[in-house]
Every structure is written in C-alpha cells, then in structure tokens.
Amino acid sequence: MRNVKAKCRPKDEKAVFLPYQQKWCDDRSRIKLVEKSRQIGFSWATSNDLVAQAIRTDAKYDFWVSSRDEIQARLFLQDCKKFADGYEKFIKAQSGVNVYTDEGGKPYTSFDIKFYNGIAIHSMTSNADAQAGKRGTRVLDEFALHPDPLKLYSIAYPGITWGGQMAIISTHRGSQNFFNKLCEEAKFNGNPKKISLHKVTLENALDQGFLFKLQNALPANDPRQDMDETDYFNDVKSKCADRESFLQEYMCEPMDDASWFLSPDILEDCFYRYGEAWQTPIDECTGSLYIGVDIGRTHDLTVIWVLEKLSGILF
C-alpha cells in the first residue's frame, strides 16, 4: 500500500472490499435496494458476490443482470469474468477443480459465463419483458435509469418465487421516479415489500475508506493524490453542474421533479433507445419536410436537422 493522503482508512487495509460493500454483499434478503453515490464500487462488488454464489455446489438457479442498456450489462459481466478468473486460478491451484464448465470451447461470451455446476450468469437487455420466464437471482443495476423502472420491477419480482434474491442498485433520477418511490415506501410507509434498504452517500463512502482505495489505484501523478477527504469532497462538489445535481448524483437526494418545466418522464419518452432505428430515408417520407439550421458562430457546432410533418405533428 502507498503512503497516501487519505485520513480515513479501513480497519483491514488489505481487504478487497470496503465495509459498505461487504455489508451489501453479505445481505441475503429476498429484496435489497441501495440508494448510492456515483462510482463508489457497488456494481463491482456485486459482480464478485454473484460469482461467489454461482460457483457454490448447492447453487440452483442462474443469475440475471439487467442494466440501463446492453453495453452496461456486458461491462458488469466483464467484472464478473475477472473475479471468476481469480477464483479459477486459486481453486484450481488448491484442488485441481475447474470453476468454469468443461465442455470444450470458451466457457463465457459477451452475454453469459458458464460454470462447472451448470449455473450461469447472464447479461440481459434493458427491455423489462426480457425478465419474464427466468428464475433465480436478478441484479437490476442503474435501476432508476431504466426506460421503465416500474415495469422492470413488476416483471422481475416474480422471478425469485422459487429462490434467489432481487438486488436493486441505483443513483436517484428525480423524485417521481419509481426508484425513489420504493425508497420512500421502505422508509416512511411501513415497508410493505420488506425491502432491505441500504444508503451510501459520497460522504459515507469517504468515512469508510473510499479515498484510501482510490488513491492506491490512481497513478502517482494524479492531482487527487494530494487530497484528503475534505479536499476530495469539495473538489467533486465544485465540479458538478450545479448544487442540485451534486445532491442527486453523490448525496442520494433526488431532484424535485416539480421544479422541472418538462418532467424527466416526458423527456425520456422522447429519447430513442439504444439500437432503435430512428432515421428514415428521404425517399420514403410521405409528408412535407422541414429543415432547421442552428449555426455555431464561435465554439459551438452547427446543427442541421430535417423533420417530417405527419398528421400535423413534426417527427
């Protein structure tokens, strides 16, 4: 370990996980949820936990990972593979047993990892309907950023009927998002779903050794090497777009949607999903076409866009 400037250090400096990560991984409640700061290692720690569960001899069902888009889910699976490689190396050296399945060919793809006991970890599309018909533990990563969190929860929950747990991981995305409604229900309305609720702000993470871990991972010439926890906290805060975004992204305080001229739900309905076709060839247009131009005179880009008028609406 380096001689770093961080003052808050974990009790066991060589431990892989910080206390809040370990507490999350040790929680075997049927439904657990964490409202968290950005980039404090929850998805990474959860990927190790999935592998540790999947390679057990008594594992019964597969594990399903859904994130806000397919790319993010595959990145989660890449972390799973790194941990699985570590388990494979250690266990094989100790007992000669393979962790991965031994069927010839690669035991993993971009979408799944297969283990010796027939259990697999799968990455999934963000489409909530993909949750149907699948049994076992599911991780709903970046939950509030999914296209439809309410639908995702509704279809994912029945999948743990025969065993496993549902782990919901997210930063907030507005006070009216279903993620925040789950948090408020658990805190203030009797917790009817019996959710095991975790909350870790940036301040909480720093108190438990986050900066110590970060500085040991950063290059020696990174300017954050000269910071203590107070310096780092203030640096992050000062670089956020505004106070409200800092509170939401790092302090688990959702933005008040009532202050938005257009609500996040309305804006999200206007987004094209990843992989969704959005361009129409000009020769296939049947309505009148309108062109708009916004000229960037100094540092901004010039933008040109074409819209088609159908039934009185421009698309």
Q: Predicted regions: what is each one?
A:
Residues 1-293:
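Phosphate/NTP-binding elements of NTP-utilizing enzymes
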Residues 286, 295-315:
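Metal-dependent catalytic core segments for phosphate chemistry
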